[in-house]
Amino acid sequence: MREMNLLVTSSLGVLLHLVVLCQADDDSELLVNTKSGKVMRTRIPVLSSHISAFLGIPFAEPPVGNMRFRRPEPKKPWSGVWNASTYPNNCQQYVDEQFPGFPGSEMWNPNREMSEDCLYLNIWVPSPRPKSATVMLWIYGGGFYSGSSTLDVYNGKYLAYTEEVVLVSLSYRVGAFGFLALHGSQEAPGNMGLLDQRMALQWVHDNIQFFGGDPKTVTLFGESAGRASVGMHILSPGSRDLFRRAILQSGSPNCPWASVSVAEGRRRAVELRRNLNCNLNSDEDLIQCLREKKPQELIDVEWNVLPFDSIFRFSFVPVIDGEFFPTSLESMLNAGNFKKTQILLGVNKDEGSFFLLYGAPGFSKDSESKISREDFMSGVKLSVPHANDLGLDAVTLQYTDWMDDNNGIKNRDGLDDIVGDHNVICPLMHFVNKYTKFGNGTYLYFFNHRASNLVWPEWMGVIHGYEIEFVFGLPLVKELNYTAEEEALSRRIMHYWATFAKTGNPNEPHSQESKWPLFTTKEQKFIDLNTEPIKVHQRLRVQMCVFWNQFLPKLLNATACDGELSSSGTSSSKGIIFYVLFSILYLIFY
């Protein structure tokens, strides 16, 4: 009996010792001492375990008061302990009220209080804390007019936990707050949102080692405006040393909506002034007046500055300023003037449908959206707002089934393709072909799985932005009612992304599964991402992308000064004849 008591006592002692050790380990992970100051974590559940999260760490001084529109300034070190247990404010932005209460649109709206004091980042760290883990840094999208790092769809805990990476998300100013551009002014130089991102990258570079991450392994990834931002950091000399690899989801930095000239940036700033009744005696007067306005006053009129009615165009975006971007994006791509590394990138099947719903006549989330011929023609004009009449005729000819041109479904799907090809897919294909000539390894995907629980109507297909939930592991959450096949797809995508971040190659070195091939300019191979076994294809939408990337620009350039070909009446037939002749010559010589 005495021996049994001793055994029990000894066992209890061992257990208590283990508990103390575990508690000590837990306490050692509670605080992180960064170069800015001490940060206290929160411990959050993930699947059947836990992970450490550091939410709302400041990386810049609040851009408020006279700091509105200025470049960011680094956060001054703090004394005491920064409590990083709750998400930060969302940046001031336009809120989508088109479909109040509808979860498909509400999921993208701010879910925290909006404030100009919003420059914070979030970090998810596996537990126990790793020694030198790969770092993945997310940049959200939203057309440079909206977006928040705190959205449920961007919760980094599943990706960090399942793939054992340190996951970071940052915030940056959007709309006029981040991209008002008066070139030559230090008070509103433009590209402040991109500089916010760069400052966050610098903070991560300087401090991520204290969280168990390796600063030499940072992979940037982002979607839509986020992936345009990622591409812009690839191009910008001042950003290149702050990360190693890049993942671009749904597009590239050269998309037609993603940047404007400094002259157009200034015109939009002046137009904002006019809408808010500000004085235009000088840039200083204009900026001071805009600083005195409430944030919502700027947001309420920001769409008024666009030069024409359009789809997939946004008011305040990056400018090609000669500083962040030394020269035009095209000249930098042609010269190989960018960071040469491995990139993984791709698009979704129906990149255009979301934007048609918000701007084109005849489209509705509550119907099949069968589009009349008249509405189709109106949609073409909105989709290619810079084109003259002959250019619009060319787009119409390219995307019309002339055996069935009054078919409402074909007209609907044709506009979906026009918007997606013009604004996302074909700019990406132009970028990837230019980049691959100089890069060190490129992988291309085509995401074509429509989630089983998607609340948007069937006609919208595989929508812009709806691969993100698979990248961040939401199908692993049983309560969200994804299928087992979708959970497997999400795990596969997360593993592709993380393996690429770790090695520069999404494939497992010794896996017997089908391989994701390198993209080359000659073969242009890519894979489908869906619940089926991997399939390899070549030359993604090559016919349409030759039209957008080569033919249409030459056509518009050739007819830019010919007023007759842009007028109505009898010149329409002249335009068709010119188009046909130009097409024949193009096919012969190109």
Curated annotation (Swiss-Prot):
Gene Ontology CC annotations of this record: extracellular space; plasma membrane; side of membrane; synapse; synaptic cleft
Expression sites by tissue: Found in the synapses and to a lower extent in extrajunctional areas of muscle and nerve, and on erythrocyte membranes.
Assembly, per entry: Isoform H form is a homodimer; the asymmetric form is a disulfide-bonded oligomer composed of a collagenic subunit (Q) and a variable number of T catalytic subunits.
Catalytic reaction(s) noted: acetylcholine + H2O = choline + acetate + H(+)
Disulfide bonds: 91-118, 278-289, 426-545
Active site (record annotation): 224 (acyl-ester intermediate), 351 (charge relay system), 464 (charge relay system)
Keyword check for Disulfide bond: yes
Signal peptide per UniProt: 1-24
Entry keywords, A to Z: Cell membrane, Disulfide bond, Glycoprotein, GPI-anchor, Hydrolase, Lipoprotein, Membrane, Neurotransmitter degradation, Serine esterase, Signal, Synapse
Gene behind the chain: ache
Known role: Terminates signal transduction at the neuromuscular junction by rapid hydrolysis of the acetylcholine released into the synaptic cleft. May be involved in cell-cell interactions.
Post-translational modification: An interchain disulfide bond is present in what becomes position 596 of the T isoform.
Sites where a glycan is attached: 83, 440, 481, 557
Recorded superkingdom: Eukaryota
Pro-peptide region(s): 568-590
Keyword presence, Membrane: yes
Designated name of the protein: Acetylcholinesterase
Record GO terms (molecular function): acetylcholinesterase activity
Residue stretches in coiled coil: none
Gene3D superfamilies on file: alpha/beta hydrolase (3.40.50.1820)
GO BP: acetylcholine catabolic process in synaptic cleft; choline metabolic process
InterPro entries noted in UniProt: AB_hydrolase_fold (IPR029058), AChE-related_enzymes (IPR050654), Acylcholinesterase_fish/snake (IPR000908), CarbesteraseB (IPR002018), Carboxylesterase_B_AS (IPR019826), Carboxylesterase_B_CS (IPR019819), Cholinesterase (IPR000997)
UniProt similarity note: Belongs to the type-B carboxylesterase/lipase family.
Assigned EC number: 3.1.1.7
Class of the enzyme per the UniProt entry, highest EC level: hydrolase
SUPFAM superfamilies assigned to the protein according to its UniProt record, in alphabetical order: alpha/beta-Hydrolases (SSF53474)
